[in-house]
A protein has these predicted regions:
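Exposed low-complexity, polar/acidic, P/S/T/G-rich flexible segments that act as propeptides
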Residues: 17, 115-138
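Generic serine detector
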Residues: 2, 15, 67-70, 100-104, ...
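Internal, hydrophobic beta-strand segments that form the core of beta-sheet-rich folds
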Residues: 9-11, 77-121, 126
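Short helix-loop boundary/capping segments
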Residues: 2-82, 86
C-alpha cells in the first residue's frame, strides 16, 4: 500500500524574493492511504525531477474534521493559511532550508493542483468555488 497511491494536494510556491529561493506549501485534499493526513515536512527528494526544496504540508485537521474518505460528501475548507505559512517559514529556517524567517520576504508565486497517481487507480474529484483572498491589514 505504501508503494502506490492516489493523492491530491494543492501546492503553492512560497518564494523568498530577497534571496531568490522558494519552498512548497501544501494543502491536503485527498490521499487514499490515510483517513486523516498528518502534518508533513521534508525535502523534495528521491526522483529525477525533484526540486530539492523544503515541503510543508499542513495537517488535514487544520482545514476540516472530516475524513478524506467521506466519498460523495462535500468537504469545505475555509481557513486563513497565513499562520500556517508562517509556521512553515519558521520550520524551514530552523532546519537550515531557507535564509530568511521574515514573513515580508515571501510571496505566493505559483500554485498547482492535480492528481499524483503512482498505481493503476481510477479516480475523479470535483472541486467547487476554489479561491484565494489576500487581505491587507494596516
Amino acid at each position: 500500500p505504501s508503494l502506490h497511491c492516489a493523492q491530491t494536494t494543492l501546492f503553492f510556491t512560497v518564494s523568498d524574493t530577497a534571496h531568490d529561493d522558494m519552498w512548497w506549501f501544501g494543502v491536503p485534499i485527498f490521499d487514499n492511504r490515510e483517513y486523516v493526513r498528518a502534518e508533513y515536512m521534508a525535502l523534495d527528494l528521491g526522483k529525477d525531477d525533484c526540486t530539492g526544496k523544503f515541503i510543508y504540508t499542513a495537517a488535514q485537521t487544520e482545514f476540516t474534521d472530516k475524513s478524506f474518505h467521506s466519498f460523495g460528501d462535500w468537504i469545505d475548507y475555509d481557513r486563513d493559511i497565513l499562520p500556517l505559512i508562517a509556521r512553515g517559514i519558521c520550520e524551514a529556517k530552523r532546519r537550515g532550508y531557507t535564509k530568511s524567517d521574515s514573513l515580508s520576504d515571501y510571496r505566493l508565486t505559483t500554485m498547482n493542483l492535480g492528481w499524483e497517481i503512482t498505481g493503476t487507480y481510477s479516480a475523479a474529484m470535483e472541486i467547487s468555488r476554489l479561491s484565494l483572498e489576500a487581505v491587507i491589514v494596516d
